[in-house]
């Protein structure tokens, strides 16, 4: 049961870190290469 509670505490933290990294990457790509849908 301790492994399950450890998963419940680490999974949201890992998801928040990963999603914030991906969102920041998308923002930086759109900052340097705007209108990427027109290529």
Curated annotation (Swiss-Prot):
The UniProt entry, under Gene3D superfamilies, shows: Single helix bin (1.20.5.510)
- Tell me the Pfam families matching this sequence: PSI_PsaJ
Transmembrane region positions? 7-27
- GO cellular-component terms in the record? photosystem I; plasma membrane-derived thylakoid membrane
**Coiled coil where?**
none
Q: Chief subcellular site?
A: membrane
| Membrane-related topology note | Single-pass membrane protein
- Identify the keywords attached in UniProt to this record, alphabetized: Membrane, Photosynthesis, Photosystem I, Thylakoid, Transmembrane, Transmembrane helix
Role of this protein = May help in the organization of the PsaE and PsaF subunits.
- Recorded protein name is Photosystem I reaction center subunit IX
**Organism whose genome encodes this protein:** Synechococcus sp. (strain JA-3-3Ab)
Gene designation per UniProt? psaJ
């Amino acid at each position: 049961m301790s492994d399950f509670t450890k998963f419940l505490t680490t999974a949201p933290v890992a998801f928040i870190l990963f999603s914030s990294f991906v969102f920041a990457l998308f923002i930086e790509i759109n900052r340097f290469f705007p209108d990427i849908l027109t290529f």
